[in-house]
Amino acid sequence: MALKHFNPITPGQRQLVIVDRSELYKGKPVKPLTEGLSKKGGRNNTGRITVRFQGGGHKRSYRFIDFKRRKLDVVGTVERLEYDPNRTAFIALIRYTDGELAYILAPQRLAVGDQVVAGNSVDVKPGNAMPLSSMPVGTIIHNVELKPGKGGQIARSAGTYAQLVGRDQGMAILRLNSGEQRLVSGACFASVGAVSNPDHGNINDGKAGRSVWRGKRPHVRGVAMNPVDHPHGGGEGRTSGGRHPVTPWGKPTKGKKTRSNKATDKFIMRSRHQRKK
């Protein structure tokens, strides 16, 4: 899908660049595969703000996406491609030969009328799902499981993908978009292809209101606040904050490493922080 640019007839349209979604289905989603979403506004169950700068936004309904792909050896046909307000990728409505409907993440080069299938030994073509142990080395994949049967967790947002670069003692070696190389069990399922909507990274909202439509409120800098609100606040005139960057709660930020899950370090063969050679 292409990008749409606009003539600058208003200030908000001067910089506006959006994805052309004219080829997507224009109707409503399949009702049995949707559920109502209530607005949280960044609040928890006690009503206190736990995530700042969230609130408002257009009403949404949640689409149930099949991330597990465990309907094995049943062929499904792509009925239509749809927009999903809850994610950056597009989704595809699949009708299986037994009549069941399901939504899956739409990969690039998947078109209406194409057939997809999940199984232990299926063709390597976009939209098909299979265990990593059944894939040829070098395959571009998305929606990759970290634990067999848990459902895809890696490479699910627009334009992303991972690559199967090798195998080792029942484990698959993946190269992720970040540059990280990681071991995953060969029994984990993954889907073939890269995720749809690769132009998502090139859009320009053109005005603050488009972020508000998505439920994102203005992100206020700490140095623009008062001392009561932030460690960087206060000072006469504009200041640089006067200390190394910290969160509103005084903890170091901007580059401070926060990873604490040492149990899975053994699965990371090459860190995403290593210098690119």
UniProtKB/Swiss-Prot annotation:
Cellular component terms per the entry's GO annotation: large ribosomal subunit
A biological process (GO) of this protein is: cytoplasmic translation
Keywords for the protein's UniProt record, in alphabetical order:
Ribonucleoprotein, Ribosomal protein, RNA-binding, rRNA-binding
The protein's matches in InterPro entries, at most eight in alphabetical order, are given as: NA-bd_OB-fold, Rib_uL2_dom2, Ribosomal_uL2, Ribosomal_uL2_bac/org-type, Ribosomal_uL2_C, Ribosomal_uL2_CS, Ribosomal_uL2_dom3, Ribosomal_uL2_RNA-bd_dom
Task: Give yes or no: UniProt keyword Ribosomal protein.
Answer: yes
Residues of the region (Disordered) are 222-277
SUPFAM superfamilies registered for this protein in UniProt: Nucleic acid-binding proteins, Translation proteins SH3-like domain
Q: Tell me the GO molecular function terms.
A: rRNA binding; structural constituent of ribosome; transferase activity
Asked if the record carries the keyword Transmembrane, the reply is no
Q: What does this protein do?
A: One of the primary rRNA binding proteins. Required for association of the 30S and 50S subunits to form the 70S ribosome, for tRNA binding and peptide bond formation. It has been suggested to have peptidyltransferase activity; this is somewhat controversial. Makes several contacts with the 16S rRNA in the 70S ribosome.
Summary of subunit composition and partner proteins: Part of the 50S ribosomal subunit. Forms a bridge to the 30S subunit in the 70S ribosome.
Q: Which HAMAP family match?
A: Ribosomal_uL2_B
Which NCBIfam families does the entry mention?
rplB_bact (TIGR01171)
What family, per the record? Answer: Belongs to the universal ribosomal protein uL2 family.
What protein name is recorded for this chain? Answer: Large ribosomal subunit protein uL2
